[in-house]
Every structure is written in C-alpha cells, then in structure tokens.
Amino acid sequence: MFNFANFYQLIAQDTRLQPWLNVLPQQLTDWQNAEHGDFDRWLRALNKIPQGVPDQVDLKNSVTIGSSTPFHTGELKKLESLLKTFHPWRKGPYTVHDIHIDTEWRSDWKWDRVLPHISPLKNRSVLDVGCGNGYHMWRMLGEGARLTVGIDPSHLFLVQFEAIRKLMGDDQRAHLLPLGIEQLPKLEAYDTVFSMGVLYHRRSPLDHLIQLKDQLVSGGELVLETLVIEGDENAVLVPVDRYAQMRNVYFFPSARALKRWLEQVGFEDVRIVDENVTTIGEQRTTDWMTHNSLPDYLDPNDPSKTVEGHPAPRRAILVATKP
C-alpha cells in the first residue's frame, strides 16, 4: 500500500493547495482499493530497493544518481534486476549507480526543446499532467522548482517514480499521484502547468485546455506539447481508428489551430515555440522497453507516413499565459 501522508501534510501547509484535501484522500483510497494484476509483484520489488543516501545527484543536465561509495558488482546486478521488474520503461533516461536505464523515449531531447522557451522555474510550484514516470519532474527540480506535482493514472509509472525517488533519498519536493486531470478540483494553485503528450488522448480537447487553465494562478504559464499536423488554423486530423497503432487518440490539430483553441478558451500571449518531426532516434525499442516502438509504427516504404497512412508523428510546443 502507498502512503500519501507526506503529501497531505505538505498541501495542508499550502493555502493554495489546501482545498484539495476535501476530495483527495477519498480519491486515493478508492484507487488503493481497486485491484491491478501486477501491482503486488511490483510492490514486492519496490520494497527490496535500498533506500538511497546519494551524494552525487545531477538533475540539471540529466537524471543521475551516484555515490562516492560505489555499489559492489553483486549489489548492482541485484538492483538492475529489480528495476527491470518494472518493464517497460518508457520515459527517461536515468543513470542510477552506473546502471543506465535506456528508456523507449529520449525524454531529455524533449526537455531540451522545451526549456529555452519557458519562464524560469526557480521557486515555482509546478503541475505536470500526464507525467509518465516523472522524468520531467526531476528535470524541473533541476531548474529550481519549489514543488513538482505529477498526475498520471498508470500504476506502473507510479512504481517507477517511487523507485527512483527511493534511490534519490526520498526527495519530498516531487510527488506523483495516480489521478487523471478530470479528478482535480479547480485549484488555481500552480505557477506553471505542463501538459505534454496528453491532448490527443482527450475526447474533448477544449475541455482539457480549460481544465489546465483551472489549475493555474492568474499570470501562470501553460506549457503544452502534443502531436500536430501541418496546415492552417482550420486543419485538424481525426483518425477513424488507430494512429501509429494507438487506439485511444482523437484530435490532431495543426499548431496554428491549437493556438486558436488556446486563445478561444481564454489564454493570452500564445506562442508556437517549436515544431519537430519525431525520429526513430528519439523513440525506439531498447533493453528496458522491448515491445514495438516508432520504427514499427511507420510505413516501411514511406517513413513520412504511419502504417495507417496518416502523416508521421510531428510534435509542437506552445506556451501561453492565463490572464
């Protein structure tokens, strides 16, 4: 069982987050009571991971955990085996006591594209919606964020996050909650909100943008990253079935259409700061994620298209301000 008591204590002392206590404990109790087939096995492995007291931590340039007292070879092999229990590792990479967790995604590449365009995170309270296993939350702390809260309903992502946090020395500046954005009350509590790789999974994209706006303080910044298509402000792709083998996908606007959507729901100073075609160097199969990946989702005869005939994955980053 997970104990969220530390997070409850933290938000009880934060006047902007206090109202969350009206609903959050019951939501997390309901989550704990829901069964998941692999969860007990993952928890047993998590409990065997040693509590870290690292004296070499880099969150600025990577997510690297080390110690001046190195692990013995046998200890490293045992730790690597435990971490591989949490396969597949999709977001990263991580370096943990010389173990390189080579994840499916080079999430550090995305961070390098995002970082030059956002307001400095120093002393900011940050919400990361659809945070995966929390890789970017650690990078946000590396940029000086005061607090990072991530939400993602995946059991596996939570266990992966807690494994890294345990090895990190139980850092209490980052917290991952197994919730979806629709479960959050209107908090208006965060200085910066990130939504990266989520919008195309939402049946109602405008409602998602409003939900993100509802979490920001006045003057707060939204960082939105999602799959897009090329085209003008009226261009939107709505796949009939799958897109790059993904089923639960709905709307792929052009970056210009997405800018209009953000303005329509009340954001100001909306900027398209990056567009980038995803390469097979950024998303691929590895020893830590052995399932199919981007190379399997593209047309083998025309990599500019998915296997379904849609335009190949193209991602945009937009930054906007809540008035």
From Swiss-Prot:
Keyword set includes Cytoplasm: no
Source domain of life: Bacteria
Catalytic activity: carboxy-S-adenosyl-L-methionine + 5-hydroxyuridine(34) in tRNA = 5-carboxymethoxyuridine(34) in tRNA + S-adenosyl-L-homocysteine + H(+)
SUPFAM superfamilies assigned to the protein according to its UniProt record, in alphabetical order: S-adenosyl-L-methionine-dependent methyltransferases
Stored Pfam families: Methyltransf_9
Residues noted as binding carboxy-S-adenosyl-L-methionine in the record, renumbered to the chain: 91, 105, 110, 130, 152-154, 181-182, 196, 200, 315
InterPro entries for the chain: CmoB, Mo5U34_MeTrfas-like, SAM-dependent_MTases_sf
GO molecular function: transferase activity, transferring alkyl or aryl (other than methyl) groups
Gene Ontology BP annotations: tRNA wobble uridine modification
Enzyme class name: transferase
Keyword entries, A-Z: Transferase, tRNA processing
Record's subunit section: Homotetramer.
Primary role: Catalyzes carboxymethyl transfer from carboxy-S-adenosyl-L-methionine (Cx-SAM) to 5-hydroxyuridine (ho5U) to form 5-carboxymethoxyuridine (cmo5U) at position 34 in tRNAs.
Family label: Belongs to the class I-like SAM-binding methyltransferase superfamily. CmoB family.
Name this protein carries in UniProt: tRNA U34 carboxymethyltransferase
